[in-house]
Amino acid sequence: MSKIKRRALLKSIGAFSVAAGIPSALHAENLVKPFQLKESFSETDILIVGGGTSGTIAAIQAGRTGARTTLIECGSQLGGCTTTGGVSFPGIFHAWGEQIISGIGWELVLDAVELNGDQLPDFSKIPKSHWKHQVSVNPALYAMLAEEKCLEAGVEIRYYETPTSVKFDNGKWLVESIGKGVKTLISTKQLIDCTGNALITSMAGYKVLREKETQPGSLIYSMGGYDFDQLDLSKIPNRYHRALRQNMLRSKIRKTGENTFVPYGYVYVNGADSTTSETHTIANQKGRQILLELIRELRELPGCENIRITSMKTETAVRETFRIEGLYKITKQDYVSGRVHDDSLSYSFYPVDLHREGKSIYQEFLKPNLVASIPLRALIPKKSENFLVAGRCLSSDRLANSALRVQASCMGMGQAAAVTASISIQEGVTPAKIAPSLVKKRLEEYGAIIPN
């Protein structure tokens, strides 16, 4: 049967089915049972909380080791800032002409680039601006590929859930997670906090740190309906020039892999905090209010009367909340000097990048041929057992953290934490007691690049 005939047949069957079902549907009786919360118990080897930049990679890696792996994500998709937050521009994977972060994170980025028909920057050339070596990805594709890789690795994904209690009992963690109509008690041998806010670390009773003043978040959007080249900028206040220029550039088709602009527009959201549902709600409302006011103001400008929003992310991307107090705290001096520790498991390359209430950015760049590294001890909270973190909440001072928080670095941490957790199970010891050489060897087997 030809495809055309088959489609016609299916269409006719569908139409008949709908028509046949109408009379009974009109006379159907609605029997609605009272709402009941489904309670259950589950066991897993490695439980990862947070399906963002680091958690997604940690879950894929944990699953690929053969460990039973569960991933809790409070949202509807994986990827975190790369997808939901809209920073679809991960980096930095290369430094001084060489690749310094590879493994599963790089694999995922490459797959997203290839499937979207995009091109990579020329990493052999050292750019004048660090962000020119970041990689543009299609966020929708990235989210789908991340989910596919998790499922292929056997990961159980639990969307729309958040933990409500965390207890250590007889060498295992008991995590109560609640979601839409479900409450599950999960027993796990290893627990990895990838929330970005050190939420699980705090719930477990370990110390966390926070600055009195935190960096602003960003609500990412795009707009159209105007021609930047035709605008008379002399009639438009300077404070609007960046937003107008940025979105004009974004609409242009890139013909090479070279980044000539950051591929999104954004507004700063001071005090953005994703730690609780209440603070997260405030951050998102504030971001949308700021953007709405910007659009109203722009439409009053000459040549901008038809400006319109073409897309807006559903969440404000957050830069800074809580950090753990780990067995080792990475300092700014460690970072900018490119210090390598005996237990360094992954690299990090990005300038110290402290955003100050949207008014200025303090940056400090690494000197030629220096690359920072991340020791295992910075991923382990003090006095913890069978517990790791990955992502921006690692143990670090504020200035070091402003560089360590970026996506490629978080991906490397996620993979390192997952491999460490799997070895902990195999060896029957807590992560802090594992020989770093054993973790390094296993990471290399999975394609990661180890600091030396």
Where are these regions (language model features)?
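Beta1/beta-strand and adjacent pyrophosphate-binding region of the FAD-binding site
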Residues: 40-52
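Conserved N-terminal/central alpha/beta ligand/cofactor-binding core
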Residues: 61, 67-68, 74-165
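N-terminal Rossmann-fold NAD(P) dinucleotide-binding loop
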Residues: 55
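Flavin (FAD/FMN)-binding glycine-rich loop and adjacent Rossmann-like elements that form
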Residues: 81-82, 143, 160, 179, ...
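A short, basic/flexible loop-to-alpha-helix module at the beginning of a structural domain
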Residues: 29-43
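N-terminal export signals
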Residues: 2, 8-28
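Conserved beta-strand-loop-beta-strand element in the redox core of flavoprotein oxidoreductases
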Residues: 167-184
